[in-house]
Design a protein with these regions (language model features):
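Thiamine diphosphate
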Residues: 1-169, 173, 176-327
């Protein structure tokens, strides 16, 4: 497969378009997804190709169109339900958690719910407390849901295609600050399997497990660590559920130190789960306690100066890793 560069947003759109051409059961529904092309312009042009029967604009009613999507999935369609801000998945909780996630189990496996909830996460866009939250830990907690967090354009396309083809409900969180980030994306068809982590950078002194936009942040920190004589291994889990526990454990056993970085809150969050996995599986190989880094325990501020302080940065990840290595 030949490669070219796409932005993260272009990769998402290409994945959806290719799957809609491949499978007539796929459709997309949400607010401002047709003529407006999505608030972040990631769907521009799709309605012109597929029409308003398959790119469906809805009123401002997340519970309503989420319910339409769940019902359509139960009856054989493959909907992509677009929730423009991750904060608004709070309005879809009954449809997502009580209906989509439960139907397969409650029907004894007779009902499949092949639905994708596509939404966002991430701060530093100056969108204030109600449009900047990272709530992926909430849904990672729910049996019956799969949760993907693409960290770049390649992952954005591959994970979306996997999600649309999956017979289970999938929630994809896209970091809205990454939509213009460019990266290599193969031209041919490809998918990325769920539950398979990727070692983004090999190292020997410390393992840094990072999700979503914290992957490039951690790779930047790894370069700073290299200058300080510390070799950092950076791992992208890609999915918080299913979680590739073995890759994380094996890396921590090799390096003897682990740092977990995520943009969600530390309290009862993704970092806590991953840290416990590493502590349980690699305890006798660790030379230091597993450290966690996440968002500050406050609503996301509107002030640019304060907002930037609430999430991990290359510098803070570098300092935390260096402290773990006692350098």
């Amino acid at each position: 497969m030949s490669e070219r560069e796409l932005t993260y947003g272009e990769a998402v759109k290409e994945a959806i378009a290719e799957e809609m051409r491949r499978d007539p059961r796929v459709f997309l529904i949400g607010e401002d997804v047709a003529e407006a092309g999505h608030p972040f312009k990631t769907l521009v042009g799709l309605v012109q190709e597929f029409g308003t029967d398959r790119i469906i604009d809805t009123p401002i009613s997340e519970p309503g169109y989420a319910g339409i999507g769940v019902g359509a999935a139960m009856t054989g369609m493959r909907p992509v339900v677009d929730v423009m801000f991750g904060d608004f998945i709070t309005l879809t909780m009954d449809q997502m958690v009580n209906q989509a996630a439960k139907a397969h189990y409650m029907s004894g496996g007779k009902i499949k719910v092949p639905i994708v909830f596509r939404t966002t996460l991430g701060a530093t866009r100056r969108s204030a407390a109600q449009h900047s939250q990272s709530l992926h830990a909430w849904v990672s907690h729910i049996p019956g849901l799969k949760v993907a967090l693409p960290s770049g354009p390649y992952e954005a396309k591959g994970l979306m295609k996997t999600a649309i083809r999956d017979d289970s409900p999938v929630v994809i969180f896209e970091d809205k600050m990454m939509y213009r980030v460019k990266g290599p994306v193969p031209e041919g068809d490809y998918t990325i399997p769920f539950g398979v982590a990727e070692v983004k950078r090999a190292g020997r002194d410390i393992t840094i497990v990072a999700t979503s936009s914290m992957v490039p942040v951690s790779l930047g920190a790894a370069k700073l660590l290299e200058d300080a004589g510390i070799s950092a291994e950076v791992i992208d889990p890609r999915t918080t559920w299913p979680l590739d526990k073995q890759t994380l454990i094996d890396s921590a056993k090799k390096t003897s130190r682990a740092l977990v970085v995520d943009e969600g809150y530390e309290r009862y969050g993704v970092t806590a789960e991953i840290a416990s996995v590493i502590a349980d599986g690699a305890f006798y190989h660790l030379d230091a306690p597993v450290k966690r880094m996440g968002a500050m325990d406050v609503p996301v501020p509107f002030s640019p100066v304060l907002e930037d302080l609430t999430v991990p940065s290359e510098r803070t990840v570098f300092e935390a890793a260096r402290a773990l290595c006692r350098r």
